[in-house]
Amino acid sequence: MANAPKVFIDGEAGTTGLQIRERLVGRTDLQLISIDPDKRKDADARAEMLNSADAVILCLPDDAAKEAVSLVSNPNTVIIDASTAYRTAEGWAYGFAELDSEQRGKIAASKRISNPGCYPTGAIALTRPLVSAGILPAELPVSYNAVSGYTGGGKAMIAQFEDESAADHTRAPYFIYGLSLSHKHVPEMQKHGGLLTRPIFTPAVGRYAQGMIVEMPLHLSTLNGAPSLADIHAALVKHYKGEAFVEVASLDEAKALTTLDPEGLNGTNRLKLFVFGSDAGGQARLVALLDNLGKGASGAAVQNLNIALGLDEAAGL
């Protein structure tokens, strides 16, 4: 334990930070260090913690994350940023290890790792394998429809649903948002999905805490070679073969389902993909199921931490 790498979570009191801490507490292969709560806003104290750690996980808003990065002068400190600030930035490894065969190595070799967004994790997981396989044309306009538990919106949205004194408190069971089609996750989806055309993203929130479904509907006739559902399924299976945290449901399992529960993978770092649709109708409905606070946030951060520090990738997961 004495020689175990030191890990500092900057923003450990937030929703994602708390879940990361829960996954790391008690591990003997690393040392979790914390700042005095009274000094969380003290730049000098934070800088000392950031530079004394072997790895830091930033669970902060974008601007605060950028400030934290600017405080790191130790060239050996690994930074894993959970904000959107660096997800499309040069010099940062994108922290979706299953993106392609080279991504895990890029994460392991990098000192700057950007943790993926929850919605993009599902969208990219469905899209990138099909683009790489030549099935989905990179220039094809695609749409992503998604629903998340309200924790996906951070403290503000949690208060909106749970705090009756909040100015924007709602009793709605479900609502759509991102109506201007300018959600901040779209550039990330496009870049790491391998798309040349900006996708349409239509998110929604339900009155439940966590759990997420991301969908990509497709007309088979718009794809290269007019593939069948089995062809699409085979491409996904091939891409994720051997991956511990990404599962592609069998076509038989998908066919037997009549509904899908967005809370189905809560508390895990798993991501499950489904191929629904109709060959006769020439349409596919691809679906990703995940915990927005698991594989969509804290779980992915711990997975990236393990990779970056050369530890067991599944530790704490």
Swiss-Prot record:
Active site per UniProt: C118
GO CC annotations on file: cytoplasm
Any one Gene Ontology molecular-function term assigned to this protein's record: NAD binding
Keyword terms: Amino-acid biosynthesis, Arginine biosynthesis, Cytoplasm, NADP, Oxidoreductase
Metabolic or biological pathway: Amino-acid biosynthesis; L-arginine biosynthesis; N(2)-acetyl-L-ornithine from L-glutamate: step 3/4
EC number: 1.2.1.38
Subcellular localization: Cytoplasm
SUPFAM superfamilies tied to this protein: Glyceraldehyde-3-phosphate dehydrogenase-like, C-terminal domain (SSF55347), NAD(P)-binding Rossmann-fold domains (SSF51735)
PANTHER family xref list: N-ACETYL-GAMMA-GLUTAMYL-PHOSPHATE REDUCTASE, CHLOROPLASTIC-RELATED, N-ACETYL-GAMMA-GLUTAMYL-PHOSPHATE REDUCTASE, CHLOROPLASTIC-RELATED-RELATED
Biological role stated in the UniProt entry: Catalyzes the NADPH-dependent reduction of N-acetyl-5-glutamyl phosphate to yield N-acetyl-L-glutamate 5-semialdehyde.
Protein family (similarity comment): Belongs to the NAGSA dehydrogenase family. Type 2 subfamily.
Stated name of the protein: N-acetyl-gamma-glutamyl-phosphate reductase
Species in which this protein is naturally found: Caulobacter vibrioides (strain NA1000 / CB15N)
